[in-house]
């Protein structure tokens, strides 16, 4: 099996949509997951457009010619650093280095674009994602705490 990481292309749209649905189904397990899912619009059938937009970089990774995960970077102008908005690897391909390879590719792409930092989301309790980012040198810089009021 040969691993690969590459920038996504329009024809990856169907796979990206499937990965997005799988990833979102797992968000509810973690504190804040439901709220994060509500704050990040579902891309759905618009992945083909996202992968060609200059605002985004989307990577896919897998083995041989089978994609098994994705990572999405948002370069929105209102942020002071590009944001890894989503990273997901299918459960049967975890612990094989695909997530690490995509995070490293994301860092390289952000450096190439002249960024001096990169941010990423990791939910409380999601140790796999936190550890993935920490292996690449990303560290926590902000925790947002919430208390629901009334209603």
Where do the language-model regions lie?
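Conserved N-terminal entry element of GNAT/NAT acetyltransferase domains
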Residues: 1-14, 29, 151
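Conserved GNAT-fold acetyl-CoA-binding loop/helix
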Residues: 21-46
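A short helix-loop-beta-strand connector motif used in the catalytic cores of GNAT acetyltransferases and
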Residues: 45-60, 83, 139
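Conserved beta-strand-loop-alpha-helix junction that forms the acyl-donor binding cleft
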Residues: 91-94, 120-129, 146-148
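Conserved acetyl-CoA pyrophosphate-binding loop and the N-cap/start of the following alpha-helix
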Residues: 93, 97-105
């Amino acid at each position: 099996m040969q691993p690969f990481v590459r920038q996504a292309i329009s024809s990856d749209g169907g796979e990206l949509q499937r990965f997005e649905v799988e990833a979102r189904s797992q968000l509810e397990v973690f504190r804040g997951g439901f709220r994060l899912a509500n704050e990040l619009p579902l891309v759905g059938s618009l992945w083909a457009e996202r992968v060609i937009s200059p605002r985004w970089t989307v990577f896919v990774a897998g083995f041989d010619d089978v994609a098994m995960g994705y990572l999405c970077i948002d370069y929105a102008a209102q942020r002071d650093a590009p944001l890894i908005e989503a990273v997901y690897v299918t459960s049967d391909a975890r612990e094989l280095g695909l997530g690490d390879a995509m995070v490293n590719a994301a860092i390289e792409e952000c450096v190439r674009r002249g960024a001096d930092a990169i941010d990423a989301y990791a939910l409380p309790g999601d140790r796999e994602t936190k550890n993935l980012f920490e292996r690449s040198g990303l560290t926590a810089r902000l925790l947002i705490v919430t208390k629901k009021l009334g209603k």
